[in-house]
Amino acid sequence: MNNSRILINNLKIFQGINQNVINLLLILFGTLLLTISAKVQVPFWPVPMTMQTFVVFLIGATYSVRLSFLTLVAYLFEGAMGLPVFAAGGGIVYLTGPTAGYLYGMTIAVVVISWFANEGYSSSYLKSFISIIIGSIIIFALGVFYLGSIIGYNKALQAGLLPFIPSELFKIALAVLLIPTLKKILK
């Protein structure tokens, strides 16, 4: 892994620690943030929101492509093994259930956002917006597509996309405002 591309490695607390240990700690920290963000619901209109996609955006913007991918794979593995990391619990059923497409979409989105960040797309608000909006589209496209294969595509749009647009726009705006600042802090 190219250490210069992992912004979070620049923190002084990691100086002198073996890179493999750092990577493991970052993966565990990422899965912890994903779990907490899946469990905590924030009142919002028209439906309550979790901050899970926001955490995906931050992981993608601050971790390397490989580390961000491994973090999401570890998160899915923890859930598949029965750990209650997902919004409604854990177990292999969540990887094939109605929301599985969103989970797989987050895994692809974090890699895409990380790739953009490694190409300099986290250095400005506009570039951050581009990478985050692409990531969000990936999450919802896969989520709605998979959900639609179960309940029908019209219902999937009505239940799995439209109610979440306001809260997703809020999370995108928050991430776009925060990522360039994080990049400056972590340099």
Placement of each model-derived feature along the sequence:
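Interfacial loop-to-helix junctions that mark the boundaries of transmembrane helices
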Residues: 16-19, 45-50, 91-101, 129, ...
